[in-house]
From Swiss-Prot:
This is Large ribosomal subunit protein bL36c. It comes from the Eukaryota. Belongs to the bacterial ribosomal protein bL36 family. GO terms for molecular function: structural constituent of ribosome. InterPro entries: Ribosomal_bL36 (IPR000473), Ribosomal_bL36_sp (IPR035977). PROSITE patterns: RIBOSOMAL_L36 (PS00828). GO terms for biological process: translation. Keywords: Chloroplast, Plastid, Ribonucleoprotein, Ribosomal protein. It comes from Lotus japonicus (Lotus corniculatus var. japonicus). It is found in: Plastid, Chloroplast. Transmembrane segments: none annotated. NCBIfam families: rpmJ_bact. It holds the Pfam family Ribosomal_L36. GO terms for cellular component: chloroplast; ribonucleoprotein complex; ribosome.
Amino acid sequence: MKIGASVRKICEKCRLIRRRGRIIVICSNPRHKQRQG
């Protein structure tokens, strides 16, 4: 899980979701998991 100031989709399967006021990226590729921190 990458935690950074800016998150973006890396591939076509990445999905941007807002959870508890945070923007997270979930993907079938675990390397693409990100959270805005």
